[in-house]
Amino acid sequence: ACARPLFTELQKSHFKSMSQYQVLEETAKDPEQFWLVGSGSRLPEEAAKPGNASSMQDGFNGSKHGSKLQWLHSTLASRRKRVHLHFEDLEECYLSTRTKHINYNSTDGLKAFTEDLSKFTRYSSIRPLATLNYATDLLNGTSIVSSIEFDKDNEFFAIAGVTKKIKVFEYGTVIQDIVDIHYPVNEMMCNSKISCISWSSYHKGMLASSDYEGTVTIWDAFTGQKVKMFQEHEKRCWSVDFNKVDTKMIASGSDDAKVKLWSIACDHSVISLEAKANVCCVKFNPASRFHLALGSADHCVYYYDLRNTKEPLCVFKGHKKAVSYVKFLNTTELVSASTDSQLKLWDIYFPYCQRSFKGHLNEKNFVGLATDGDYVACGSENNALYIYYKGLSKQVLKFRFDVVRNILEKDKKEEDSNEFVSAVCWRMGSSVVVAANSQGTIKVLELV
């Protein structure tokens, strides 16, 4: 109830000229008059309206200048709509940023807030680029994709799941194909359903997989040959991850409540870490050979220094159900997903939740989680992909998969569908996300 008056006081105290907040406030009141362009500048009323005579040149059907203004107007209108939709969220973002700097005359934090404004309005929609199918039998509904990962150069991506197959596709070929009939460059058959895959960041073509029998397998993805197998887990293995610093090191987590550390140079595990409950996911800090995060069925995220595994460095508490995924946004921030239908943002130096993300539905399945460092993508049990910006709690974009039905199910309503988005992967250095659902449909999507 007191957020808006406090926000107004901050605006009056700290800003004597047109500022980020004034533009934001004016946009909400009169979206035709102002808009944020770049860092704290404004677009005047006469320039924002392409129909204004002073901004148009004579000529058949308007000029190039007029066309550019029309395009600019439509773009800004889209951004205005998103700012208005997330206005309360932006207030909270502003307050949390500014209150960290208690000096009355300080302008610290404004740059971060400006960057948040710019980044969260960067994309307005999701555009499909290509469609693939993981299913071996189009009549078989059990073709859940459990994991999608790009290789170290973002040239190839692998898809794995319950059909026991790992399919490797060349990204450039998939995008360039005119028709949506795509063939993998290689295909590997496993002995059990696959839960997770991870590419080596050093050896081109080296891929690790974990499966429902508890086996961790190292593959040469281009020859399709098994390089090594590790079989120490006693139950289903949910997650596997290559270390980006020590490129011979691999971690795996299992229902046997153990995290195993492997070296591709050794035949047996080099470290065995005992957890308090089933381990659903493991992820190395991308800048460290020693630091590992794991998500557990006891609702917690644990952060370990592998040089001393007796106690975790930090335990992140806040989820109400099992933690299914953990991903690092950067070297200090990580995001977790849980079957409590929430994502949570954490900082390794602080034990409390930085932000919760709500909007998607996730109560029982692994639905995928990916990030490019600023945006977070996750699946949902309503057969949709959700995109969040790390500075805001509500989703900024959503893409719904089509429901494919057989003859017996054609009269079912879409909301009665049991399909869910099951795997998500970000193509790093780009705005491309690859997502798959429980029917085995894979979409290559671009944020625009």
Which residues fall in each region the model found?
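WD40/WD-repeat beta-propeller blade-loop signature
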Residues: I144, D153, P184, K193, ...
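Beta-propeller domains
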Residues: Y104-D137, F157-E187, F222
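WD40-repeat beta-propellers
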Residues: I166-G172, I197, V216-D220, V240, ...
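Loop/turn segments within WD40 beta-propeller blades
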Residues: E149-N154, I197-K204, S210, T223, ...
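Intrinsically disordered terminal extensions that flank WD40 beta-propeller domains
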Residues: A1-T142
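Conserved strand-to-loop turn within each blade of WD40 beta-propeller repeats
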Residues: A160-T163, S209-E213, S252-D256, I264, ...
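Structured C-terminal portions of repeat-based eukaryotic scaffold domains
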Residues: R307-A436, K443-V448
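WD40/WD-repeat beta-propeller blade N-cap
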Residues: A135-S143, E187-I194, Q231-C237, L273-V279, ...
